[in-house]
Amino acid sequence: MSAAGSAPVAAPAAPVPSARPHTVRPVPIDELAAVLTTEDHPFDVDHATAVTGVTLRASDVHPGDLFAALPGARAHGADFAAEALARGVAAVLTDPEGARRLPPDAALPVLVHPRPRAVLGAVAAHVYGDPTADLGVIGITGTSGKTTVAHLVEAGLAAAGRTTGMLGTVGIRIDGRPLPSAFTTPEAPDLQALFAVMREAGVADVVMEVSSHALALGRVAGTRFAVGAFTNLSQDHLDFHNDMDEYFAAKATLFDGRAEHAVVCVDDIWGARLAARVPAAVTVATTGASADWRAADVGTDADGGQHFTALTPDGPVPVRLQLPGSFNVANALVALASLAAVGVPAGLAAERFAEVAVPGRMQRIDVGQPFLAVVDYAHKPAAVAALLDTLRAQVPGRLITVLGCGGDRDRGKRPLMGAAAAQRSDVLVVTDDNPRSERPADIRAAMLAGALDEPGHGELHEIGDRRAAIVAAVDAARPGDAVVVAGKGHETGQEVAGVRHPFDDAVELAAAIRGVITGVLGAAR
């Protein structure tokens, strides 16, 4: 290591599974205008046009679409109206500035709204027939744990024999079938179209991760939630939100009447604060706080998993997880309480939990090496601390951590992540994550500054090349140690200066281990 109203019509053909429903009812433009009309913003549109889809990307316009021309950071969507017209757009939704930018010869109806993004979700939901009225949507929000809770809920719904859709960080699935990854973080029109696709496919319930960005930017507007679930809150996304209070306020909007049921983990002060704002919420706790759902008799299994007893309103339920860490006990309780809210008994759901593994979340890599190797998505200070604390309790030897921070994101968390990792690692290798448009060395320097400020920190190394950093960590490992590669988890690419390069931590870690094993065997021969 180196130191330092009408009959349905067929929608345009698309790949199966489709990102749009196969059939839609043409919606007259005056009907859409009525959806948008308020006392402050009346609409009076006299036009025979009907809409059969919604998009905010001119390049994705299908004939009959409503094109949402929204203002952006670099350009206004209305500047691309000519392309939308060439593709057969039926109508435009935009703001006053967008209306001024439209081609003067654009002979089509234009709906002008002062905040078109705020109403886009409701418009798209109406065009696609209000799909979530027919779906049980379970929305999960929080800084950490959303993906794990989503996978556990999906497993519980499957145990109950219910056809399920899932939207989250690791992708989108309909009854187990993946959809293209480009739709992993859907904008409002894409989201409502996906819900309609799921309804067509016979889906009964949808599990959805709900980010603070999705809430603040109106991406889930027009969505009816059967359950809103809150896991926890810690520092992240302060490049988007001004402070933690604003970050919390964005998360809390999921519980402002959008969800029929609320489930809140009160293990941190933010959860307790949210529960106080939502008196009808079902509460979950693992820390001794008073709650409707609690955990008891938590123990570790020989294979690294764990077990506990869920103390539910209907009595105790035994739970086993292959996922280690106290935070996953909380995640499992949130999942069980959310499932109970939609009629799935905790005992039935818990039977499936032991089978759940989540890509890039405490993912073990085993190719026969005499040390533990783990890939995890931890990319915020609290998550790094929780990950390493969990592994420290399991590992007799040293903790060797490979960690970086993403560029063009919350800069304030970089020294905090460096400190959290340095405090808990015997060896910390600071490397690149997704630098994006930033200078990678600057990101590493911020992390190292935090690490160096941590009293009693372990060995510190800086290796910018992530592949080389992983190889160096593996090369340093001895029997009984643990090598932890954190920050990217399930991701299969690394974003550098506008280019996405193929890179998978799990693949790279396995390859590095095989290389070391082969080298050792070769030397022995």
Please state what every model-predicted region is.
Residues G98-P104, M208, F225-A373, G450-A451, ...:
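Acidic, Mg2+-coordinating active-site environments of NTP-dependent enzymes
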Residues A86, A90-P96, H261-V266, I400-L403, ...:
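Short internal beta-strands
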Residues G72-R74, S212-H213, S234-D236, D268-I269, ...:
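Short glycine-rich anion-binding loops that position phosphate/pyrophosphate groups of nucleotides
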Residues G72-A75, V358, V384-P455, D465-R466, ...:
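Active-site beta-alpha connecting loops in nucleotide-dependent enzymes
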Residues L32, D65, A84, V123, ...:
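Residue-level signal for inorganic ion chemistry
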Residues A482-G515:
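Glycine/aspartate-rich loop-and-adjacent alpha/beta segment that forms the canonical ThDP
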Residues M1-A122, A296, P324, V358, ...:
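N-terminal leader/targeting and accessory segments in enzymes
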Residues V119-V266, W270-P279:
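Phosphate-binding loop of NTP-binding sites
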